[in-house]
Structure formats: structure tokens, C-alpha cells
Amino acid sequence: MLIDHDALKELCNSPVNKDKNGEFTQDPEAQWNVKAGSDGQRKSTYGFKAHINADEDGLITSTDYTPGNVHDSNCFTSLLDGDESAVYADSAYASEKHATWLKAHKVESRIIRRAYINKPLTTKDKQFNRLHSGTRCTVERVFGVLKLHYDTAKARYMGLNRNRTRFELMCVAHNIKRGQSIRQYSCA
């Protein structure tokens, strides 16, 4: 199973915006998220995070939707359904707690290894990352499709539950379309 997350901006993402009645337009259930951009600079966004578990065909098997300040690894075990043979994820999910959980449930860990301060990656860890990072492109592609075709890059409603419901409906639509595509090309 492939696990990943994506930060979704809240539509009215500035806490100082006020509507014509003088009330804040900021969603009180959304939170700030800080992550490194592609240029290496830290970027802050206000909104939610979407977490998905996808299989090797790109079908979404489980989702979670949280405020932006929830760390990605907090949703790890809730995304797993128990019948996985291996789990692929980025280094945000690397922890002793998760390694222990995976070992106890006899699931092979293919979580990308992370370097720490004064502890660079070994050659073996670099080879492991190179070998398994290519498989993760499937889940990244799912997020790309959700953003491009289903407009999930921004939260459209006020409130966590409304946005979660919308995201889950988009995931259902994605699975229907993806399932039809798999069926079409497997019969040919």
C-alpha cells in the first residue's frame, strides 16, 4: 500500500480578512501548516491536510482529512486496513513506533529512510531509497489527478466535515474513473 499526504489551502486563507459584516472569513477549524517548498524556502499555508492510502493500481483504499497542523505520521495506522503485505511512504512516516507496529502486524516496511543531523544515510540506505522511491510515484500521481481534474487543491467550504465529505466524494469519483480505465485496458 502507498501512503501520502497533501496540504490543501483554505479558500479564505488570510486570518485578517473580514467580510462586509466585519466577521473573520477564516475557517476556525483549519490550521497553519509549514513545509519546505520546491525552492527550499519554508512556506506557510492555512488549511487542511488530505491523507490517502492507494494500492498499486492507483485506487484509493482509505482517506483521512485533518487540520493543517496535524503531523502526517499521526494518521499512519488509521490509513492501513490490515491486509497489506508492504507499505511504501515518504520519510515523514518514518518512526520507531511505526516500525514496531508494522513488524507486529507482519507488514514489510518500505518507508523511505531519512538522514539526521550528524548521521548521514549509509550507502545501503541510499540504495534502499533509490529502489523503493519509484514505487511511490503512484500515490503522487493520484494526488496530481485529484488536484488537476477534481479541484481538490483548495478547501471549498467552511468546516472540517464539509471539506472531508467533498474530498471523499472526489476520491470515490476518482476510483470509479480509475476502475473503468483498469477494466478497459485489462480486457484489451
Question: In which residue ranges do the predicted regions lie?
Answer:
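Feature captures the catalytic cores and cofactor-binding loops of soluble hydro-lyases/lyases
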Residues: 102-103, 115, 120
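Short hydrophobic/aromatic-enriched beta-strand-loop microsegments
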Residues: 105-113
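Short, acidic/turn-prone active-site loops that include or flank metal/cofactor-
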Residues: 67-68, 113-117
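Short secondary-structure boundary segments
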Residues: 91, 113-114, 141
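Polybasic low-complexity intrinsically disordered regions
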Residues: 1-91, 96-104
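Basic, amphipathic alpha-helical segments enriched in Lys/Arg and hydrophobic/aromatic residues
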Residues: 125-188
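Short, charged, surface-exposed secondary-structure boundary motifs
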Residues: 74, 97, 118-125
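Acidic/polar loop patches that form or flank catalytic/metal-binding clefts of enzymes
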Residues: 87-88, 110-111, 181
